[in-house]
Amino acid sequence: MHPNMKMWTGWAACAFLLFVCLGTLTEGYPTKPDNPGEGAPAEELAKYYSALRHYINLITRQRYGKRSSADTLISDLLIGETESHPQTRYEDQLVW
């Protein structure tokens, strides 16, 4: 095989694996409930709104634990002075 053919085969394999990984990630995402339509009975609308509320709660739920602690760590490092990381004297305004 030519080196160019090997390179294209490798790129094709990587692209295929990327699509497979993205496909598995989207399967874990909840699906939006189907709208029963305008002339639906009250029971169907109640089921739909209950399912829609559950769907919105799943998507917008707050995540605690490792994820929030990493966000806190990054914001602490970016903001600068916190209780655990006091400002150093070199970050103070220099007086000449």
From Swiss-Prot:
The molecular function GO annotations come to: neuropeptide hormone activity; neuropeptide Y receptor binding
What GO cellular component is one of the record's annotations? extracellular space
The subcellular localization recorded is: Secreted
Q: List the disulfide bonds.
A: none
Q: Name one GO biological process term.
A: feeding behavior
Among CDD domains, the record links this protein to: PAH (cd00126)
- Name where it mostly resides: secreted
Q: Which PROSITE patterns match?
A: PANCREATIC_HORMONE_1, PANCREATIC_HORMONE_2
Q: Which Pfam families match?
A: Hormone_3
Q: Which stretch is the leader sequence? A: 1-28
Tyrosine amide: residues carrying this PTM:
Y64
Q: Kindly state which keywords UniProt assigns to this record, in alphabetical order.
A: Amidation, Cleavage on pair of basic residues, Neuropeptide, Secreted, Signal
Q: Which family does it belong to?
A: Belongs to the NPY family.
Purpose of the protein: NPY is implicated in the control of feeding and in secretion of gonadotrophin-release hormone.
Name listed for the protein in its UniProt record: Pro-neuropeptide Y
Organism of origin is Carassius auratus (Goldfish)
